[in-house]
Curated annotation (Swiss-Prot):
Required co-factors: Fe(2+)
Protein name: tRNA N6-adenosine threonylcarbamoyltransferase
UniProt subcellular location: Cytoplasm
Native source species: Trichlorobacter lovleyi (strain ATCC BAA-1151 / DSM 17278 / SZ) (Geobacter lovleyi)
Keyword Acyltransferase: yes
CDD domains: ASKHA_NBD_TsaD_bac (cd24133)
Binding site for substrate: 133-137, 166, 179, 183, 273
PANTHER family the record matches: TRNA N6-ADENOSINE THREONYLCARBAMOYLTRANSFERASE, TRNA N6-ADENOSINE THREONYLCARBAMOYLTRANSFERASE, MITOCHONDRIAL
Length: 342
């Protein structure tokens, strides 16, 4: 099946053409980072307007780069949710319009489902496995028993880890988005220079909390006579990142042991973080388990990642009608398509 995928859940307008849920023929991502940087975060109204501006040229570019026409597209997968409602509506409206005009089967895919299956574009992982999804809006642990079969084990009770990175970067005067810059500066610092808390580290649940860590950074900065720079800034970034990674690793290890799983998948934008990738590799080596972390190009928001689930659903005859709408909130364990799959 040649599938067109469309993603507009936040601040990237993306489209991709993928064959048989594996072979990426094209993947186009138009980022709005520069647009939102001056506001220190994503402005929903601006994001929606930018999606409206870019959706048609992005889809056209994806088709051109793949060397296919709309007449050759056999299915359309689109991010239905969760995300910014106005942004989602742009992608869903485009997908429904193409499906109607060209009589192409359509399916809505969960954004997080895309992230946790993104690595399948490189190499499928046998089920069941544990999935850690870390991004600007999510920090979730799932047990995955098959495509469409997800059970949540733990989630953040406040800030997502990517949000904590961006807010900390703002406190440090690094601008938005600052996660990648903190990661780069951390590589030159000492992870033990500043003792930051590890929220919920010893809590029996598999939930996360990062708002307190962000507050701890603010408290530390208020005690300093000047804005940190140079080696001091590097140490602060390294110490913050060490705290984040320790919490993520400990909770992930606890989930693996609780569920008796031998395979781990890490996805989402924060999976680009070099410190986290290294920490998870160390965990996998120590526990002798299989680890999959997609290449960075598949970690951030993109449309190609939707094709794995989209192709599986459409191939099994699971499709949505034109009454399908975008939804800002949509728990992954309520996707409930697995009963229709072989």
């Amino acid at each position: 099946m040649v599938l067109l995928a469309i993603e507009t859940s936040c601040d990237e307008t993306a489209a991709a053409v993928v064959r048989d849920g594996r072979l990426v023929l094209s993947s186009v991502v138009s980022s709005q980072v520069a647009v939102h940087a001056e506001y220190g975060g994503v402005v929903p109204e601006i994001a929606s307007r930018k999606h409206l501006e870019m959706i048609t040229p992005v889809v056209r570019q994806a088709l051109d780069e793949a060397g296919v026409s709309l007449a050759e597209i056999e299915g359309i997968a689109v991010t239905r949710g969760p995300g910014l409602l106005g942004a989602l509506l742009v992608g869903v409206s485009m997908a429904k319009s193409l499906a109607l005009a060209c009589k192409i089967p359509l399916v809505g895919v969960h954004h997080i489902e895309g992230h946790l299956l993104a690595g399948f574009l490189e190499q499928p992982v046998a089920f069941p496995f544990l999935a850690l999804v870390v991004s600007g809006g999510h920090t979730h642990l799932y047990r995955v028993d098959g495509i469409g079969r997800y059970r949540i084990l733990g989630r953040t009770i406040d800030d997502a880890v990517g949000e904590a990175y961006d807010k900390t970067a703002t406190l440090l005067g690094l601008g938005y988005p600052g996660g990648a810059l903190i990661d780069r500066l951390a590589q030159q610092g000492s992870p033990t220079a500043v003792k930051f808390p590890r929220p919920l580290l010893h809590d029996k649940s598999l939930n996360f909390s990062f708002s307190g860590l962000k507050t701890a950074v603010l408290t530390h900065l208020k005690k300093q006579p000047h804005v940190p720079e140079g080696a001091e800034l590097h140490d602060l970034c390294a110490s913050f990142q060490a705290a984040v990674c320790e919490v993520l690793v400990k909770k992930t290890e606890a989930a693996l042991k609780q569920e008796g799983l031998q395979r781990l998948v890490v996805g989402g934008g924060v999976a680009c973080n070099s410190g986290l990738r290294h920490a998870m590799q160390q965990l996998a080596t120590r526990l002798k388990i299989e680890l999959q972390i997609p290449p960075p190009v598949l970690c951030g928001d993109n449309a190609a990642m939707l094709a794995v689930a989209g192709d599986a659903y459409l191939s099994a005859g699971c499709q949505d009608d034109l009454a399908m709408d975008a939804t800002a909130t949509w728990p992954l364990d309520q996707v409930a398509r697995w009963e229709q799959l072989p």
